[in-house]
Structure formats: structure tokens, C-alpha cells
Amino acid sequence: MAVCIIDHDNIRGVIYFEPVHGKDKVLGSVIGLKSGTYSLIIHRYGDISQGCDSIGSPEIFIGNIFVNRYGVAYVYLDTDVNIFTIIGKALSISKNDQRLACEVIGISYINEKIIHFLTINENGV
């Protein structure tokens, strides 16, 4: 599983990339945006040293999220993205090609436990 913890200005949230029943899903929630439709986009680099200006070009459009009148978006999207190819890249929340928030996608703590468990079982330990 991969995770992106968003904490950019007043925009906050958590987005998970995980397999659910054999399909990859994007799950989470975001707060702090105005009501409307926004895009989730994976960018080439995970370099946020200069904010969203240094994350490179857009590579993968994940889908649109819809923010309600209370400023909350609940995310539940299907994706064909291979989770392990996006770790270390940046995820942006954009509207009209303007990047409003961006953070780096990392490996989640839960994923490390699963990998450790599978390694133990494969070695017969």
C-alpha cells in the first residue's frame, strides 16, 4: 500500500493507494478546499523543495474528486496504476491546471508489515 499525507497550506488529507478485492483503489479524504471538482494527478518527481513548482510534469491522471459545500472530499476511485511505480513521486490536487496542493507518495507502514509477513512465510519461518 502507498500513502500520501497532504498538509499544504490549509489543505489537509490522506490518500491511500491499495488493492481491494483484486483491483487497485484510491481511497481517502481531503479537507480545506472550496466546493467543486478537483483533479488528482501523479507527477514525474517527488521533489517538493520548491513547493508544487518542482514536482515536474503531470504523468498520470488518477481521477476527479468532488468537494462538498463543507469543504470535504471523500475519495474512492478505481485506478490501473501499479502502486509500486508511483512511490517517491508527487501527487497534486489541481483545478484548472493550477496545482493547489502537492505531497510525496510513500510506502505505508501497513505495507511494510505485509511484506515482512510474506517474507517470513516464503522462507518457511
From Swiss-Prot:
Disulfide bonds join C52-C102. Keywords: Disulfide bond, Host cytoplasm, Virion. It is found in: Virion; Host cytoplasm. GO terms for biological process: superoxide metabolic process. Coiled coil: none annotated. GO terms for molecular function: metal ion binding. One of its GO terms (cellular component) is host cell cytoplasm. It comes from the Viruses. Gene3D superfamilies: Superoxide dismutase, copper/zinc binding domain. SUPFAM superfamilies: Cu,Zn superoxide dismutase-like (SSF49329). The keyword Disulfide bond applies. Belongs to the Cu-Zn superoxide dismutase family. Superoxide dismutase-like protein with no enzymatic activity. This is Cu-Zn superoxide dismutase-like protein OPG175. It comes from Vaccinia virus (strain Copenhagen) (VACV). The gene is OPG175.
